[in-house]
């Protein structure tokens, strides 16, 4: 299988850089996969789990929004936050969700809609983390 270069960058670090077979991205308009030779595109990403496939090995990384750009040079994802499952403190993640639920009382109108949408994304990630597919 042909490979391509992939960089995953967050404000804190270069989370991943290297040659990969495939990257599956949680897009705002729907999840999508990138292979070598993919058409150029820029897409917004939603909070979710990004999967990097290299030589049959899958690495899952939580991203909390950002942008993905596919070009002739490869794929670059600029993520608001990027955390590998090995680095994730699951108890802290669950606490963040609880705090978000409590904080819903402070929002109304459009702000409430956005807060609920973000909470739903976090809960979806938590559910994926609990599934057997993540092991």
UniProtKB/Swiss-Prot annotation:
Record bears the keyword Ion transport: yes
Keyword Protein biosynthesis on entry: no
Topology class, membrane: Peripheral membrane protein
Keywords: ATP synthesis, Cell inner membrane, Cell membrane, CF(1), Hydrogen ion transport, Ion transport, Membrane, Transport
A single GO cellular-component term on record: proton-transporting ATP synthase complex
Pfam families for the chain: ATP-synt_DE_N (PF02823)
Domain of life from the UniProt record: Bacteria
One Gene Ontology term from the biological process aspect of the record: proton motive force-driven ATP synthesis
Localization, UniProt: Cell inner membrane
Family membership: Belongs to the ATPase epsilon chain family.
Role according to the record: Produces ATP from ADP in the presence of a proton gradient across the membrane.
Cross-referenced PANTHER family: ATP SYNTHASE DELTA/EPSILON CHAIN, ATP SYNTHASE EPSILON CHAIN, CHLOROPLASTIC
UniProt xrefs under NCBIfam families: ATP_synt_epsi, PRK13448.1
Assembly with partners or alone: F-type ATPases have 2 components, CF(1) - the catalytic core - and CF(0) - the membrane proton channel. CF(1) has five subunits: alpha(3), beta(3), gamma(1), delta(1), epsilon(1). CF(0) has three main subunits: a, b and c.
Protein name: ATP synthase epsilon chain
Organism of provenance: Bradyrhizobium diazoefficiens (strain JCM 10833 / BCRC 13528 / IAM 13628 / NBRC 14792 / USDA 110)
Gene that encodes the chain: atpC
